[in-house]
Amino acid sequence: MLPIRFLAMTQKTSGSAKATSIETNDIAPIPAGERHGKAWHLFTVWSSPNLEFATIFIGALAVFAGLNVWQAIIAVALGNALAAVTHGWFSSWGPRHGVPQMVISRSAFGLRGNILPSATSTLVAGIGWFAVNTTSGAFALTTLTNLPVAASVTIIILVQVVAAFIGHNFIQKFERYAFFYLAVVFAIVAVVIISQGSYDVSPATDFKWGAFSVGVALAYGYTQGWTPFAADFTRYLPATTSPRAVGLAAGLGNFTATTLLMSVGAIAWSGVVGEGLPTTAFASALPSWLAILTLVGIAVGSVSANVLNIYSGTMSFIAAGVKLGFKTRRAIMVVIAGVVGGGISYFAVEDNFRFIFELFLLTVGYWLAPWVAILVVDRVLRKGQDIDKLITEGAKHSSIGGPIAFVVSAAVSISLFAKAEMPTVQFYGALTGPGADNGDWTALTGFIMAAFIYFVIYKVTNKK
C-alpha cells in the first residue's frame, strides 16, 4: 500500500484527471483539454525503468560473450546509442498525433497489417519483459527477506499490476519519484563497483567482431525494446511541445541510464562479483548497508520497468484491433497480461536465467530492427503528408509494404544469422555457428533488408 503522503502528492496534475484516477483513454487521440506535462519529465520517465538489475546484467552478458571490460562497455554504449536515437525520434511523434506508438505504426502497416507488429509487441512487452523483470525483482526481494521465490514473485506482480491498472498519470508520477531513490542508490553502487574493478584487457586475445556484435545486439535489444512504447508516454503532452525537446529528453534518459548500469555490470562481472544467484552475487560485493539499499532498488526498479511494459503491452493489444466493449478495456487487459506474464515468471524464468535472458534480448532485436526500419523509411517518404488520416480509428488505410517487408526481412535474417544457445537446445542460422566468433548479425541484416524492401514497395505502389 502506498503511503498516504505519497498519494496526496499525486493528486495534483496539470490535466483534468487525477493521478490516482483510473485512466479511461486507451488508443483514441488525447483531447486538447487533457494534454499536460513538460518534455523534460521524459528524462525521468525513461531513466527510472532502466535503473534496474536487468540493465546491469546485460553488461555481464557482454563479458560472458568473450569481451574484456573495455570492449564490453564500448559494445553496450554503441547498442544503446543506436536504439536511443530512434526512441527519441519516435517519442517526438506523440504530441503531434496524440495516440500510442503502435497506432502510429498503422501508417506503414495499414489497419489490418498492423496486427502483426502489435501482437508481437504484446507478447514481448506485456508478457515476455514482464516475466523477466518480475523475476529479477523477486530474486532481490527473496535475497532481502528470505521469502520463498514464489511469494516474492506474487508480491512484485501485485504492485506492478495495481500501478499499471491505474494508468498514465499515476505511472508518470511513480517514475518521477522512483527516479530519485534509484538514481542515488545506483550512483553510489557505481562508485563502489568502479573503485573495485579490474581494468586489464583480458581476455588477452585479438579483438573479435563476432563477440562484439553480440554485445551490441544485447544492448540494442534491451534499449530498443522501449521504442514500441515511445509515443505512449508523450501523447499527453501539448501538441505545441517542441519535438526536439521531447526527442532529446526521451533519448538521453534512455541512453544515460542504460549505458551507466550496463557498464557497471561489465565491470562487476570482470572480477568483482562471484558465482550464485545473480542478485545475491552482485549484492555480496557491496557493503552490507549498501547491499540492502541496492536490493530494495532492484525490486523498485523491476516494478518501475514493468509498469511501463504491462501498460504499453496492453496498448499494443488494443491497437491490434481487439474490441472488448468496455470503457476500461485497457485496465482489464493490464490485469490479464499481468496474470499471464506472472505465470511465466513462476515456471519458465528462474531456471537458466542467464541463457533465457540472453536469448530473449536477441529475439527482441530480431523483430524490432525490421519494424523500426520500416517506420523510419515510411516517415521519411511521407514527409509533408497528413499522417493522422491514415492512423485514426475508422481509417481505411491499407498497406502491403509494411507487412511484406517485416515478414521477409525477419524470416531471412533469422534463418541466416540467428543463434540460440541454451544448455539443452541449440539453433544456428545457415551462416552462423557455435561460439562468439560467429557473432549475431540478425538485427543489422533485418534492418537493412526491411528498409530496402519497404522503400521499393512504397515507390512501386505509390506511383502517381
What annotation goes with each model-predicted range?
Residues 29, 371-453:
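C-terminal membrane-solvent junction of multi-pass transporters and transport-like membrane proteins
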Residues 39-56, 190-196, 205-268, 288-309, ...:
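Hydrophobic, membrane-embedded alpha-helices of multi-pass small-molecule transporters
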Residues 63-74, 139-153, 169-178, 279-293, ...:
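Transmembrane helix-loop boundary segments of multi-pass membrane transporters
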Residues 76-109, 117-124, 455, 459-462:
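Juxtamembrane transmembrane-helix boundary signature
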